Design a protein with these regions (language model features):
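Short, surface-exposed binding/anchoring microloops in extracellular/periplasmic proteins
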Residues: 39-77
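Noncatalytic modules at the cell exterior or secretory-pathway interfaces
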Residues: 60-62, 107-129
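Edge beta-strands of jelly-roll/beta-sandwich modules across compartments, strongly enriched
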Residues: 45-49, 74-78, 122-147
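Bacterial N-terminal signal peptides that target proteins for export
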Residues: 2-12
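Short, surface-exposed beta-strand/strand-loop-strand elements in extracellular ectodomains
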Residues: 72-92
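Beta-sandwich interaction modules
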Residues: 53, 98-109
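Sec/Tat signal peptide C-region and signal peptidase I cleavage site
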Residues: 18-29
Length: 152
């Protein structure tokens, strides 16, 4: 009886570990504070995301969404922009400091370097989390690396 319980517990633990690893392997997010001093309304953070075929197929697009993780401040919103090959898109977390992220946005640009920037609408420090995924046309996760250039 004890052996059955131990086996069941072990199998359950392994399944949960596999699920956690799969979610970790497919998810990319980064958090930071933009305008930590709270006095630069035009503060902008900048990173480069490199998308590549890691064996799951070539990248079709970069998916991005942003979440304001600070306390609510009326009129103070965070946005994320993606730029590649003379194309650009934007998404904004339209409710300051709630528990929901912005709508997702995608930029179709294939493999290569995408630029990801984060900005805000007014002075004031904002903690944010940006989620980003390089994906195939069928939304299968592809190779994704990030390098941060600027944190203001």
């Amino acid at each position: 009886m004890r052996s059955k319980l131990l086996k069941k517990t072990l199998v359950t633990s392994l399944i949960l570990a596999a699920i956690a690893y799969a979610n970790y392997a497919a998810a990319h997010s980064a958090g930071a504070t933009i305008d930590a001093a709270g006095n630069n309304a035009s503060a902008t953070d900048l990173a480069q995301v490199i998308c590549y075929d890691d064996g799951d197929g070539p990248t079709d697009h970069l998916f991005v969404q942003i979440q304001d993780a600070s306390s609510p401040v009326s009129g103070l919103l965070v946005s994320a922009q993606i730029y590649k090959d003379n194309k650009m898109t934007n998404t904004t977390d339209t409710v300051s400091g709630d528990a929901n992220a912005s709508p997702g946005t995608t930029l179709i640009g294939g493999n290569g370097v995408y630029y990801l920037s984060v900005s805000k609408t007014a002075s004031g420090a904002r903690n944010f989390t940006v989620t980003y995924h390089c994906q195939t046309a069928a939304d299968v996760h592809t190779g994704t690396d990030i390098t941060v250039f600027q944190v203001q």
